[in-house]
From Swiss-Prot:
Keywords, comma-separated and alphabetical: Cytoplasm, RNA-binding
Known function: Required for rescue of stalled ribosomes mediated by trans-translation. Binds to transfer-messenger RNA (tmRNA), required for stable association of tmRNA with ribosomes. tmRNA and SmpB together mimic tRNA shape, replacing the anticodon stem-loop with SmpB. tmRNA is encoded by the ssrA gene; the 2 termini fold to resemble tRNA(Ala) and it encodes a 'tag peptide', a short internal open reading frame. During trans-translation Ala-aminoacylated tmRNA acts like a tRNA, entering the A-site of stalled ribosomes, displacing the stalled mRNA.
Entry keyword Glycosyltransferase: no
Start and end residues of each stretch annotated as Disordered: 137-162
Residue spans of biased composition, Basic and acidic residues class: 137-154
GO cellular component, one term: cytosol
Protein name: SsrA-binding protein
The family this protein is said to belong to: Belongs to the SmpB family.
GO MF terms held by the record: RNA binding
Pfam families linked: SmpB
Native source organism of the sequence: Aeromonas salmonicida (strain A449)
Gene3D superfamilies: 2.40.280.10
UniProt-listed InterPro entries: SmpB (IPR023620), SsrA-bd_prot (IPR000037), SsrA-bd_prot_CS (IPR020081)
Amino acid sequence: MSKKNSKNKAGSSTIALNRTARHEYFIEERVEAGLSLQGWEVKSLRAGKANISEAYVIFMQGEAFLFGSTFLPLNAASSHVVCDPTRTRKLLLSRHELDKLESLTARQGYTIVPLALYWKECWVKVEIGLVKGKKEHDKREDTKAREWDREKARIMKNKHRG
């Protein structure tokens, strides 16, 4: 038997999305990283009990860590394992990627936030983005542009109907 040659996209097997990141930040660059997880965390991710909307990436001793994410334990979790839903999780990146991201975040106004959490085959991956915060007027401009695109689509739809 041959294997299927289907590539998993971030949207096809998504566990959690950070929807506010697109609204709050300009996304400069995207990087895929692995996560170092415990057994109960994998089980809760299979159940879809994850939240990355308040999370961000910090660098300590040359390593990258996901801070502020919440993986809720299942009710049937083992009683002899201490489940900390908000523990800091290590990101698995190459040394080259770590050095590059750490030097880019040293610049004024840049930070790294998780954009999506998803399955890639049997591995949990997190898509992180190098971002810069938006000002209030930038957010308003984006909202106006989105509303105008919606209005244009509505006009074209009605025009084609008759």
